[in-house]
Structure formats: C-alpha cells, structure tokens
C-alpha cells in the first residue's frame, strides 16, 4: 500500500516545511499545488522538491482558489497507482500526530474507502498575545502554539481508483466513489491561527474568495482571539485531551446542522412541488379551454 498526499498551499511560508516533513514520515509522495503564493512559500517548496524527490510540484497557478484543485491533482496521477493505494488530503497547516497507515489497512480489511480525522484546533490565545513580542520566532509553529481543543472532524483519506477520475465540477473533500466510511479517526493538529499578522492575511484571502470559505464570512474580525483557560495545553509525547463532553457537543452541533439542512431541502421540494402543480393546472385549463373552443 502506498500513501500519496495532495497539498494545496497559498502563503504558508511559516509552516509549510514543518507540515511536509511531518507528512513525509509516512507518505510515499506529496503532490504540491501552489496557488500563487507571494510570501516565499513557492521558493521553499521548489527547494524542498529539489532535495527530496518524494515532494512533487504538481501545479502553480494564479486562479482563484477552489476545492476542485484537489480533484485536478488526483486526476493527474491516480492512474499511476493501484487500487490498494490511498490518498491523503494534506492541508498546508495540518500535522497528524500518528502514522495513519495501520488504520488505513484496517479500513481496507473492512472494505472501507474513506477515513476522517479529528481536528485539534490550535488557537492564538490571550496568553500568546501577551508574550508575542518577546517570543522566540526561530522556534517552529508547533513549539510556539500550544493551546487547543478537539472540536471538528473532516474527511482526509480516500482510496485510489486507477480507472476513475474525480470530476472537477464536483466540490468535496473526497471523490463521490469513496463513500464507505471507516469510523475510527486519527487526530490531526490544525494550526490555522499562528500570528496576528498571519490570521489577518488568512482572513482577507478567504473574504475575497467568491467561491469558498462561507463559514469565515459569517464571523467577525475579532472572533479569532481565544482564552487560554478555555483550551488544553499540548505537550508532545502525551495523550491529547478529548473529553466526552466535547464529543457530545460536536455530535449535537452536527445533528443540528443536519436537521436544518433537511428542513431546507424539504421546504425546497415542497416549493418545487407546488410550482409544478400550478403549472400543471394552467396547462390543463389551457388545454380544456382549447378543446371546448
């Protein structure tokens, strides 16, 4: 079994090498798609690719970001690999805490073709802000940002199909032919909030994107600063905290979103049905009038 990663990056110079090095502990190849980085990220990944042939530059474009960039990379390389191989959607600011391959082998043994991760969101807190001017910027992001909560889950792994493409008009984390979910999930450290400057730039990029990141557009500009006392402190080599109450809160929120989504869809179907009934009545009345005339 081979594990290949797809990594889309834009202006992640402060963390991209740490992300790639972490993933290279278990990935056979990492295919990088640079979305017009201007902060030195492009130069860093080019140098990395020169020194490590497992890092492959798949594309470099100034197109507006779309989730379908992942589809494009998959379509470029999927026929190079076997049915037993897997793909890893590697976000440029994420690092798994463990090798996922043993879990992927178990997923295959159970005839599954998709696996999610639990996301440990690492926050820039009031404690980080107070110490920011004095902190050692030479330390890695994971050494400087320690406060987290595990509160989200997303698909990150899917099984390869040598014969099937991933249509580029479809959005989503995994292809539509990979819907058999393996429920156990590894934990992924997500460093979306690293410095005040990076947080501001990240938000601006997302606000200016007409196609994606609607969840960001619904938040205020000052929503990012978290209180350290509301988080757990990460120490490498120790088990991460994931209380049962946090799991309940997550599943409750997902149930709420699902019910809202179902209600909206039922309402839309009802409106469509009423519209069709009205059109049919008009059609029947017109035909009856023409017949009687």
Identify the function of each model-found stretch.
Residues 2-4:
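Cell-envelope/extracellular polymer assembly enzymes that use nucleotide-activated donors
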Residues 11-28:
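Short, well-formed alpha-helical segments that are part of the catalytic scaffolds
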Residues 31:
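Conserved beta-strand positions in the Rossmann-like core of class I SAM-dependent methyltransferases
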Residues 34-45, 61-65, 91-92:
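A conserved acidic beta->alpha catalytic loop
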Residues 50-68:
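Conserved donor nucleotide-binding strand/loop of the catalytic core
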Residues 68-74, 98-293:
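Catalytic-site signature of metal-activated, phosphate-bearing donor transferases
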Residues 71-86:
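Active-site nucleotide-sugar/metal-binding loop of Leloir-type enzymes
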Residues 82-97:
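Short beta-strand-to-loop acidic/aromatic patch adjacent to the donor-nucleotide binding site
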């Amino acid at each position: 079994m081979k594990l290949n990663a797809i990594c889309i990056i834009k202006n992640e110079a402060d963390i991209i090498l740490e992300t790639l090095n972490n993933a290279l502990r278990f990935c056979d190849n990492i295919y990088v798609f640079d979305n017009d980085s201007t902060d030195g990220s492009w130069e860093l990944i080019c140098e990395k690719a020169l020194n490590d042939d497992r890092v492959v530059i798949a594309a470099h474009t100034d197109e507006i970001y779309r989730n379908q960039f992942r589809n494009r990379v998959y379509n470029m390389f999927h026929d190079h690999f076997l049915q037993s191989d897997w793909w890893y959607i590697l976000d440029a600011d994420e690092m798994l805490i463990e090798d996922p391959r043993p879990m992927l082998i178990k997923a295959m043994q159970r005839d599954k073709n998709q696996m999610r991760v639990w996301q440990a969101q690492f926050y820039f807190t009031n404690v980080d802000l107070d110490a920011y001017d004095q902190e050692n910027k030479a330390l890695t992001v994971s050494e400087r940002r320690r406060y987290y909560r595990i509160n989200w889950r997303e698909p990150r792994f899917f099984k390869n199909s040598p014969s099937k493409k991933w249509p580029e008009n479809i959005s989503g984390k995994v292809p539509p032919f990979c819907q058999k979910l393996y429920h156990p999930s590894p934990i992924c450290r997500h460093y979306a909030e690293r410095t005040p400057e990076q947080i501001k730039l990240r938000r601006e990029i997302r606000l200016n994107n007409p196609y994606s990141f609607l969840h960001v557009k619904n938040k205020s500009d000052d929503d990012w600063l978290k209180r350290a006392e509301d988080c757990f402190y990460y120490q490498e080599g120790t088990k991460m905290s994931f209380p049962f109450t946090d799991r309940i809160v997550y599943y409750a929120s997902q149930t709420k979103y699902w019910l809202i989504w179902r209600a909206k869809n039922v309402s839309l179907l009802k409106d469509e049905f009423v519209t069709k009934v009205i059109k049919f009545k008009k059609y029947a009345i017109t035909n009856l009038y023409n017949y009687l005339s």
